[in-house]
Structures are given as structure tokens and as C-alpha cells.
């Protein structure tokens, strides 16, 4: 799954929160000596890290502070997220995942650009808020590392069949889609009867608070839910029936917008489910036709190898280009001299392709040509090329894009479910020693002292 919550966007959100005018993070400079708040295997979480992360969360709720849980509960929720980041970074490093300085610098440049400033300007803003630039770089490196771990997990374990896409496409063209929210009170694997009873009491208390109008569903989700998307108000996005577990699908069809059902017992614990709104799938999918430009071209490739060094390859491609300029037939030269075994026998014919099919640089050279013209030699990762553009056409890619979007949605749902199980296992296997006080109960419900990486029965998904 290459599409995931965009790494640059997620980092940008984290950074932009730092700049909001709430209780200043620079106050941290005047705090006593830093201390450890959690030991995570061979790593630690420092109080300063926790304070910065809490500051970022609170920045997102300026003007809506009442939706946040009490400070001591929020502290434990955020600490658990930091613990999971430490565990994921450690696992990524064990798996050989490394973030190069070039990749890190590019990500930071993108963050600065999206904040309409330079890297130096970003550095100055961070320092003004009491955050050192090396600490910021490390946090960005960790975010990218976790992204690569998740990406590798998806590529190795997540498969979406064409049959699944066909079924979902048929469902999307008829029927309804449902916008859902949920609240989860987690029950650990192998829970005792006492743990189950405590969870039942907590979910009943949450339902009572909502029914009495003391808290809106969204606020209750932020305050009490054990789901990883609690701080997003438990929003599950839009779901078609095939994306809703069978145990809930029939129930959802009978619900009215605004209705709340539960508590419901699932594999991860007790849930409350709210139907926010319903929309027609066909209307949601409808839209203008999506057209794309495709190009027809031939090319000649001279590879760079241990035996054929850069200078030798460049001299060879220059000679071939001179032959074509002197009147030699492009197809004949390609058959005789191109080192692309996939198409040299066809005179270098690449067929019809979108501009990004062979990389952005290759596509840009093709787009810059007029039909019939031949490019000057240019370099790519594969070697040295000459390209002749033969034609262009407009192709309707609406259906293809719909299938790609549905495939991505299914893959994202599978990834959420599978990765949350992976995080739960990672957390249970780790040595974690918390060195902060347990929060007191709030609203007479068992507090969400720790937000485990529990897989909700309805995992959060990318919204359409």
C-alpha cells in the first residue's frame, strides 16, 4: 500500500501545532532537570518528550479544550503513543531500515516549504518555542522510520485480489455508504471476569454520560475511547456494507443518522457505534470523466555496467544519436544497438504509456518533444537514452482510477486491522516500566489510563 496518511502532511501537522499560540513550549526550558517517564526495552521516554507531545495535541484543540480528557488521562494516552513509536523504531532498526540524511533533509525542506518558510526560518521558529533543531530532526527521522516499517509491513502481508475489487466496485455502484464513529473500551486477550466487568461498567458509564447530554459522542470518544483514533473523535470515515464487519452490517442498515447503538461486544472489547450520515454510493462515485494523456514512443538504451563505464556508455549513445541525425532509421538502430532486451527486437517500441510510467524524468523528456522528433541523449537510473515520440492520445481512465481507489481502500482497511494486531503483539512482548502516577477515574467511569494498541472491530480508515 503506497498510499497512507502522507508522511509530509503528518509531519507538517505536528510542526504547525507547535507554532500555535497556546501555552508556550519554551516554558519547558525553565523546568527542572529532565527525568525518565517510561523505560521501553533498552530505550527511554523523557519528560520533555512527553510534554512536547502533549503540547502538540492540545494545540489541535484550541477553543475546544473541553473535548480533551483530564490532563492526567491525556498524559497516559500520549505516553502510550510515544511508547509505540519507540517500539516501532526499534523494530525497524532491527529489520535494517535506515533513513538517510538526504531523505531526512528532503522531508524537513518539504515541511519548511509547506509552512511558507525556509529551513533556517523553521529552525528559528523551533528554537523560539524551546525545541532544539537536533531534537526536531530526530523526531522527523523517527516518523519516517515508522512509515517505512508500516510500508514494508503492507507490501509483505497485504494482498487485495481482483475479485475483492470487483465485489467492492459492484457494491459502490449500488447501495449506500455510511459515515460512522465509534468508542472502544478495550478488553485484553485472555481477560479475567473482573477485567470484563470493569470494561462493561466503563462502557455503560460512557453511554450514560452521552444519553444524559453531558458529553457529545465526539467528545466522549476523545475522552474515553481506547481506540487508536480516539483523538480523531473515533471517526471511521465512509464505509460501504462490504467494509463493515458482518456482525454490524445488518444493524447499521436499520440505523438512522444520529443514532447510537451499543454497548456491542466484539473481539477487541466493548463498543458504541454512531451513524453520522448516509449517502448514495452511486452519487458519491459519480463525477466527470477522468481523462489522461498517453504517449507512444520508441527508445534506445545504453546501460552503464562494470564492463561499460559511464564515459564509454555516453560515447556510444552520442554515436547512435549522430547516426540518427545523419538519416539512419531509428527502429533499425534500436534493433541493432539498444540494450533494452524488453523491446529492442520491436525497434525500441514502448507502446502507449502515461507520462510517469518510466519515471518523471523520462516522461518529461517525452512530453517536451513534438511528434516525430528525437531527443538528445539523457541519463536515467537505467543508463543513457534516446527517445522518439510517435504520438499522443487522450484516454478515459475513470474506471481504472475507480478500481485503483477501491483497491487502495480495501488495502488500507486490511493494513489497519493487521498492523494494529502487530502493534498489540509488539507492545505485549516489550518490557515497559511506567514511572508516572495512575490517573484517577473521571465522570465515574473507569479511566482510559493506558491506551493500548488494540485493534478495534471497526478500524479507522482513510476517508473518501
From Swiss-Prot:
Residue ranges occupied by any PpiC domain in the UniProt entry: 175-277, 292-391
GO biological-process terms attached to the record: Gram-negative-bacterium-type cell outer membrane assembly; protein folding; protein stabilization
One Gene Ontology cellular component: outer membrane-bounded periplasmic space
Subcellular location field: Periplasm
Keyword hit for Chaperone: yes
Keyword entries, A-Z: Chaperone, Isomerase, Periplasm, Repeat, Rotamase, Signal
Region (Disordered): 439-464
Stored HAMAP family: Chaperone_SurA (MF_01183)
Function, as annotated: Chaperone involved in the correct folding and assembly of outer membrane proteins. Recognizes specific patterns of aromatic residues and the orientation of their side chains, which are found more frequently in integral outer membrane proteins. May act in both early periplasmic and late outer membrane-associated steps of protein maturation.
Name of the protein: Chaperone SurA
Source organism of this protein record: Xylella fastidiosa (strain 9a5c)
Encoding gene per record: surA
Amino acid at each position: 500500500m503506497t498510499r497512507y496518511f502522507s508522511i509530509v502532511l503528518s509531519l507538517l501537522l505536528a510542526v504547525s501545532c507547535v507554532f500555535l499560540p497556546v501555552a508556550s513550549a519554551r516554558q519547558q526550558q525553565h523546568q527542572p532537570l529532565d527525568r525518565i517517564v517510561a523505560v521501553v526495552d533498552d530505550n527511554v521516554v523523557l519528560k520533555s518528550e512527553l510534554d512536547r507531545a502533549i503540547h502538540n495535541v492540545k494545540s489541535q484543540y484550541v477553543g475546544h479544550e473541553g473535548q480533551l480528557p483530564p490532563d492526567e488521562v491525556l498524559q497516559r494516552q500520549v505516553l502510550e503513543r510515544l511508547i509505540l513509536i519507540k517500539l516501532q523504531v526499534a523494530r525497524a532498526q532491527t529489520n535494517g531500515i535506515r533513513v538517510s540524511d538526504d531523505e531526512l533533509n528532503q522531508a524537513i525542506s518539504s515541511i519548511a516549504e509547506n509552512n511558507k518558510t525556509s529551513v533556517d526560518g523553521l529552525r528559528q521558529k523551533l528554537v523560539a518555542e524551546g525545541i532544539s533543531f537536533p531534537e526536531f530532526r530526530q523526531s522527523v527521522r523517527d516518523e519516517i522510520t515508522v512509515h517505512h516499517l508500516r510500508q514494508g509491513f503492507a507490501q509483505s502481508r497485504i494482498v487485495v485480489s481482483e475479485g475483492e475489487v470487483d465485489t467492492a466496485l459492484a457494491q459502490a455502484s449500488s447501495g449506500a455508504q455510511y459515515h460512522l464513529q465509534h468508542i472502544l473500551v478495550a478488553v485484553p486477550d485472555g481477560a479475567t471476569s473482573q477485567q470484563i466487568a470493569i470494561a462493561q461498567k466503563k462502557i455503560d458509564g460512557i453511554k450514560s454520560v452521552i444519553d444524559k447530554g453531558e458529553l457529545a459522542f465526539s467528545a466522549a470518544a476523545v475522552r474515553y475511547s481506547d481506540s487508536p483514533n480516539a483523538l480523531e473523535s473515533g471517526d471511521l470515515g465512509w464505509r460501504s456494507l462490504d467494509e463493515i464487519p458482518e456482525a454490524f452490517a445488518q444493524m447499521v442498515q436499520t440505523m438512522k443518522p444520529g443514532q447510537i447503538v451499543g454497548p456491542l461486544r466484539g473481539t477487541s472489547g466493548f463498543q458504541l457505534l454512531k451513524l453520522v450520515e448516509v449517502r448514495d454510493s452511486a452519487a458519491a462515485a459519480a463525477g466527470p470523466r477522468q481523462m489522461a494523456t498517453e504517449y507512444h514512443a520508441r527508445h534506445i538504451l545504453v546501460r552503464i555496467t562494470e564492463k561499460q563505464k559511464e564515459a564509454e556508455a555516453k560515447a556510444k549513445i552520442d554515436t547512435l544519436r549522430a547516426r540518427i541525425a545523419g538519416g539512419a532509421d531509428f527502429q533499425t538502430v534500436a534493433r541493432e544497438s539498444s540494450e533494452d532486451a524488453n523491446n529492442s527486437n520491436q525497434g525500441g517500441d514502448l507502446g502507449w504509456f502515461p507520462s510517469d510510467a518510466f519515471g518523471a524524468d523520462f516522461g518529461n523528456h517525452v512530453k517536451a518533444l513534438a511528434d516525430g522528433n528525437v531527443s538528445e541523449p539523457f541519463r536515467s537510473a537505467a543508463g543513457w537514452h534516446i527517445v522518439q515520440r510517435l504520438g499522443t492520445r487522450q484516454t478515459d481512465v475513470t474506471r481504472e482510477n475507480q478500481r485503483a481507489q477501491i483497491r487502495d481502500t480495501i488495502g488500507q482497511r486490511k493494513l489497519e486491522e493487521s498492523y494494529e494486531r502487530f502493534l498489540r503483539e509488539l507492545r505485549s512482548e516489550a518490557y515497559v516500566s511506567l514511572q508516572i502516577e495512575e490517573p484517577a477515574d473521571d465522570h465515574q467511569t473507569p479511566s482510559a489510563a493506558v491506551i493500548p494498541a488494540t485493534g478495534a472491530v471497526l478500524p479507522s480508515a482513510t476517508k473518501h
